[in-house]
């Protein structure tokens, strides 16, 4: 078995799917670790082509020989909630001004999509996490 490469850095970024380019914030974040920026951009864009329009978080592991691997996560819960509720952004004062509504089915669908990244044992616990995020954004969850 080949010896394990030594990890020199872990970079977490949220990038629009299929739209990675060497401009900030991607270029500087990768450049300071010595990663080939264009190589990452091409690989990321190819991997996220089918999810255009979503923000996809990525965790890039950089090794000492300047090679890298990356893991794609599911889109942030807030982004999925905004899309489902049809609002551009959450409320500035969430507990007084409500900006949208979500049904229990929509919350459950988002929870199923996010399940792999959430710290929840079952779909009901995941739904509660998503409902809490929605409430803190000023979006009402119908019972």
Curated annotation (Swiss-Prot):
Post-translational modification: One or more lysine residues are methylated.
Xref: PROSITE patterns: RIBOSOMAL_L11
GO terms for MF: large ribosomal subunit rRNA binding; structural constituent of ribosome
GO biological process: translation
UniProt KW keywords: Methylation, Ribonucleoprotein, Ribosomal protein, RNA-binding, rRNA-binding
Keyword RNA-binding: yes
Entries under SMART domains matching the protein: RL11
Pfam families, A to Z: Ribosomal_L11, Ribosomal_L11_N
GO CC, alphabetical: cytosolic large ribosomal subunit
Domain of life of the organism encoding this protein: Bacteria
Similarity comment text for this entry: Belongs to the universal ribosomal protein uL11 family.
Subunit structure: Part of the ribosomal stalk of the 50S ribosomal subunit. Interacts with L10 and the large rRNA to form the base of the stalk. L10 forms an elongated spine to which L12 dimers bind in a sequential fashion forming a multimeric L10(L12)X complex.
Function (record text): Forms part of the ribosomal stalk which helps the ribosome interact with GTP-bound translation factors.
Protein's name in the database: Large ribosomal subunit protein uL11
Gene: rplK
């Amino acid at each position: 078995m080949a010896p394990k490469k030594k990890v020199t850095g872990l970079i977490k970024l949220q990038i629009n799917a299929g739209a990675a380019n060497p401009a900030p914030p991607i270029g500087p974040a990768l450049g300071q670790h010595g990663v080939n920026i264009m190589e990452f951009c091409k690989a990321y864009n190819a991997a996220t082509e089918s999810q255009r329009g979503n923000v996809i978080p990525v965790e890039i592991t950089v090794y000492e020989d300047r090679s890298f691997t990356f893991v794609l996560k599911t889109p942030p819960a807030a982004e999925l909630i905004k899309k489902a509720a049809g609002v551009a952004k959450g409320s500035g004062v969430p507990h007084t001004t409500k900006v949208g509504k979500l049904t229990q089915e929509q919350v459950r669908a988002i929870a199923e999509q996010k399940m792999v990244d959430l710290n929840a044992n079952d779909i009901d616990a995941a739904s509660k996490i998503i409902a809490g995020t929605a409430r803190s954004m000023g979006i009402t969850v119908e019972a």
